[in-house]
Amino acid sequence: MSLTGEQSDLSDYVNDEGGIWSLRQVEKIRGWNNIEYGAGLSGKNTPSTGLSMNRAYIPPGGIAKAHIHVDFDVMIYVLKGSVRHEYGEGCRQSVVHSAGDMFYIEPGLPHEVFNCSKDEWVHAIVSRSDASEWQNIEPYDRDSD
């Protein structure tokens, strides 16, 4: 599996059931920035023009390098494990979220994500107000500020 953002054909995982699009596969099949993902729902496999949702998996000790979501909102629900976000200018602020927590990330906010555990995977549901998933994400140099 590539963790670089290489895209897979996601249409094989979704069924159009007459206006309700169903996804029943959530296994890890692709990745981006050291995070593994299931197929998810997006504009790639549904008619969505403004939403996407995926199940994300961060390996033990894993880090999603600093980045910015350009012009879209993100809401995350942590199913398993704990993540630490270092965020803001220079990623100098920090907050931890654990299983059962939900949180919102503002568009344009620099952040880097860390799995707090060296032994357990993090599992989370990630929702975006962008149907294109990863195309509107930019790397952020946390040492530049």
Where do the language-model regions lie?
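Conserved short histidine dyad/triad with adjacent acidic residue
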Residues: G38-L41, N54-V70
